[in-house]
């Protein structure tokens, strides 16, 4: 992952200008994402989920149940996996703690509301979504493959700039990402972007029973993909303040 050195206040101000024109459309999509994270927090707080004494992580049974709530689910049949095996849970956990939304109680047994819990809950939905998105794009410490996630994001953004994809249409997955997905069975960045409602990954028809290395993937671009590209561009490229329309996309 790249070092996110741009002042977050400046990034937020620029993004709010970009968001202004399409706020209503993006808000509906972002609400779904924030709902998953809200369920994550509420589950830990209301059920007083016991944390591991050594790592402070969520236990296997709780992870298994949490997994069933989210948009992107891991296909595990029994509660035998650790928190690190659930990319979405691992991300939500890191985000909640690093942003002071949740914190461990003094004894380290449970989660309790953090110093920023109320501020987060009172923020507008797009502000909350942008915070989640910034961690996926520019931090990556929660990921088991943060170096690969950074490369995959670069490949994806370069592809978007050349392809100029349209929302709600499907495209072949960029080759660099497709090769990694076929060889390893997963690309965590794609998992995070799916959970954030940015895109949807699907196997091409008739390929379900092929060997992983032989499979071909396609992705459906969602409306929030445009917001991702604009945020990425704001941070990584020189941004001309007079050009407020950075969109690469066509909306019919």
Name the predicted role of every residue range.
Residues 103-144, 200-251:
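Accessory beta->alpha helical hairpin/"wing" motif in late/C-terminal subdomains of nucleic-acid enzymes
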Residues 82-98, 179-204:
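Short amphipathic alpha-helical interaction segments
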Residues 2-9, 92-111:
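Short N-terminal secondary-structure initiator segments
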Residues 24-60, 121-165:
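Short alpha-helical segments that sit at the start of domains
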Residues 1-91, 117:
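Short, amphipathic alpha-helical interface elements at domain boundaries
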Residues 47-80, 147-181, 205-206:
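Short acidic, hydrophobic short linear motifs in intrinsically disordered regions
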Residues 15-18, 29, 161, 173, ...:
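Interaction-mediating elements
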